[in-house]
């Protein structure tokens, strides 16, 4: 940092000639502001940066993370970027007309000053804003998430990206597009929006609107689904959810939520065990998840479901690692609709089985381990298929798409971890033809890719380390010999062939590819060897439908 000196000799150029008369005024005002610092404020550091910015004619001023409660009224007039995020600011002074980027996230702002006419980026998330001033026509990106905003001003035609998640918006702004070629992505998730204006259809089909977790009426949902399903539809892609946006944030004690799944004669002992986990990370959201799980169609209609959940909870109580993993998986499950809870339950059952495999449950049952691996492989392929399907839909709840493929193909693909019923299949956009195509694709890819996938699967490696220590050690030795002797030349050859020699990013990518190919070769050879031995002993088969 340059030394600050009030006797600094100003160069003879146009800028400094302009400010020479006010140079002392800036310093005097800033020094006075510094002396008014509250305990904990780093105003001395802020003033040092202000003076350096002025002396150097810098176009950027960064005063973030200094615990400031206010800013001086006279900011350097030449700046184009101002970063004052992560302070304690309740208001901002008049902003320089030259400003193009304003970062003031995570403060306590209740209002904003008049915005500069050339502003391009406004980042004021995590404040206490209730409204916004008029937005300049130049604005390209804006993040106002996590505020208390009830309505929005007119949106500039230039605006490409808007994030307004978690506010109190009751309606969307009017959308006008015309011949404007801008590709837009707007996020209005988790507000209080109950209807969608017809002007949303003015947006181009390359645009995306996110309105998940809002109390949209069933009439609004049906109307949108009807419009966006039309062959003539050319409007934006709309991401929604079947959630009403009104999930209860209250939760009961974890032990109470757990014991509700057990018979009365076991509840006292179970409660005592789970009381010890009340303060673990995500315990509160896990409690809420268990209560929501009890209200799913699977819980109501599936025989033995309560016993299945109770047995799973017993396993969680006995393993801190599994419990930690499961709490994390369930962390966001209650922020959306019932089918989000059902999909999370699927993922929790996968987590349990993979954990058990890694811990040795299938060390002596290779056939069962192969069956589990095959199920995990099929689920991965279904996720790929669901992801591709989402891209084709104009009005989409992603949760419903992912769950639809798992639920509707659970029996045909022998998916033991998938629920057999879901509530909102009708809005998923997944057709009978989609399901037939997905089943065929899963079986085709399984036939051609499963053994390679299985040879790289973490739980299989854990089994090999425990039960085939000598073979595993030999495979590791072969891998590192190959990497030491062949890796550099193979990477160099790949870069030369693509004309990217000397490109650091390309070298990293090529290195990762060579590493994966090496591991694939070594571990596939080891897998074939071990499976041939084990499957011949017990009569199991590697391939089956």
UniProtKB/Swiss-Prot annotation:
Positions of the UniProt region annotated as Interaction with target proteins: 1-242
Post-translational modification note: Ubiquitinated in the presence of host E1 ubiquitin-activating enzyme, E2 ubiquitin-conjugating enzyme and ubiquitin.
Domain of life per record: Bacteria
Catalytic reaction equation(s): S-ubiquitinyl-[E2 ubiquitin-conjugating enzyme]-L-cysteine + [acceptor protein]-L-lysine = [E2 ubiquitin-conjugating enzyme]-L-cysteine + N(6)-ubiquitinyl-[acceptor protein]-L-lysine
Active-site residues from the entry: 337 (glycyl thioester intermediate)
Record bears the keyword Iron-sulfur: no
Annotated spans, E3 ubiquitin-protein ligase catalytic domain: 251-545
Record-level GO BP terms: protein K27-linked ubiquitination; protein K48-linked ubiquitination; symbiont-mediated suppression of host innate immune response
Name the record gives this protein: E3 ubiquitin-protein ligase ipaH9.8
Functional note: Effector E3 ubiquitin ligase that interferes with host's ubiquitination pathway and modulates the acute inflammatory responses, thus facilitating bacterial colonization within the host cell. Interacts with IKBKG (NEMO) and TNIP1 (ABIN-1), a ubiquitin-binding adapter protein, which results in TNIP1-dependent 'Lys-27'-linked polyubiquitination of IKBKG. Consequently, polyubiquitinated IKBKG undergoes proteasome-dependent degradation, which perturbs NF-kappa-B activation during bacterial infection. Mediates polyubiquitination of host U2AF1, leading to its proteasomal degradation.
Pfam families: LRR_TTSS (PF12468), NEL (PF14496)
Region annotation (Linker) ranges: 243-250
Keyword Iron tagged: no
Subcellular location: Secreted; Host cytoplasm; Host nucleus
Subunit structure: Also interacts with human and mouse U2AF1 (U2AF35).
Domain notes: The LRR (leucine-rich repeat) repeats are involved in substrate recognition with target proteins.
Activity regulation information from UniProt: Exists in an autoinhibited state in the absence of substrate protein, due to interactions of the leucine-rich repeats with NEL domain. Is activated upon binding to a substrate protein.
Family: Belongs to the LRR-containing bacterial E3 ligase family.
Coiled-coil intervals, chain numbering: none
Domain NEL: 253-545
EC number: 2.3.2.27
């Amino acid at each position: 940092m340059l030394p600050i000196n009030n006797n600094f000799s100003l160069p003879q150029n146009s800028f400094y000639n302009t400010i020479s008369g006010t140079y002392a005024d800036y310093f005097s005002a800033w020094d006075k502001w510094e002396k008014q610092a509250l305990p904990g404020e780093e105003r001395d550091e802020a003033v040092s940066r202000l003076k350096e910015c002025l002396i150097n004619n810098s176009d950027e001023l960064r005063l973030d993370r200094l615990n400031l409660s206010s800013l001086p009224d006279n900011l350097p007039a030449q700046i184009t970027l101002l970063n004052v995020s992560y302070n304690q600011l309740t208001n901002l002074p008049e902003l320089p007309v030259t400003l193009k980027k304003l970062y003031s996230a995570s403060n306590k702002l209740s209002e904003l000053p008049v915005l500069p006419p050339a502003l391009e980026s406004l980042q004021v998330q995590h404040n206490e804003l209730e409204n916004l001033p008029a937005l300049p026509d130049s604005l390209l990106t804006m993040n106002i998430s996590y505020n208390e905003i009830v309505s929005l001003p007119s949106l500039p035609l230039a605006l490409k990206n808007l994030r307004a998640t978690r506010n109190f918006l009751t309606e969307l702004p009017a959308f006008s597009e015309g011949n404007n070629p801008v590709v837009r992505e707007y996020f209005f998730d988790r507000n209080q929006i109950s209807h969608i204006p017809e002007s949303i259809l003015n947006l181009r089909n390359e645009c995306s609107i996110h309105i998940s977790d809002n109390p949209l009426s069933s009439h609004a949902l049906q109307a949108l689904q009807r419009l966006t399903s039309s062959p003539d539809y050319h409007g934006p892609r709309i991401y929604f959810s079947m959630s009403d946006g009104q999930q209860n944030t209250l939760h009961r004690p974890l032990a109470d939520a757990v014991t509700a799944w057990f018979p009365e004669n076991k509840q006292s002992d179970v409660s005592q065990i789970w009381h010890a986990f009340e303060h673990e990370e995500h315990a509160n959201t896990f409690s809420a998840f268990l209560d929501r799980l009890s209200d799913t169609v699977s819980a109501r209609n599936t025989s033995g479901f309560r016993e299945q959940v109770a047995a799973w909870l017993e396993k969680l109580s006995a393993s801190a690692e599994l419990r930690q993993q499961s709490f994390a998986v369930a962390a966001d499950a209650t922020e959306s609709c019932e089918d989000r809870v059902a999909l999370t339950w699927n993922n929790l059952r996968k987590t349990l089985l993979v954990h058990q495999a890694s811990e040795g449950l299938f060390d002596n049952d290779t056939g069962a381990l192969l069956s589990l691996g095959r199920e995990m492989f099929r689920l991965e392929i279904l996720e790929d298929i669901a992801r591709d399907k989402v891209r084709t839909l104009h009005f989409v709840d992603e949760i419903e798409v992912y769950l639809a493929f798992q639920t509707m193909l659970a029996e045909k693909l022998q998916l033991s971890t998938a629920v057999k019923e879901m509530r909102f299949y009708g809005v998923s956009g997944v057709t009978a033809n989609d399901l037939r195509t997905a089943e065929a694709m899963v079986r085709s890819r399984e036939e051609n890719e499963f053994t390679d996938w299985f040879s790289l699967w973490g739980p299989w490696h854990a089994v090999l380390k425990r039960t085939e220590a000598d073979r595993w050690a030999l495979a590791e030795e072969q891998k590192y010999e190959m990497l030491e002797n062949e890796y550099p030349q193979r990477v160099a050859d790949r870069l030369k062939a693509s004309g990217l020699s000397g490109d650091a990013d390309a070298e990293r990518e090529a290195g990762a590819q060579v590493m994966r190919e090496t591991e694939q070769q070594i571990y596939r050879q080891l897998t074939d060897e071990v499976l041939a031995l084990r499957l011949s002993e017990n009569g199991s088969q590697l391939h089956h439908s």
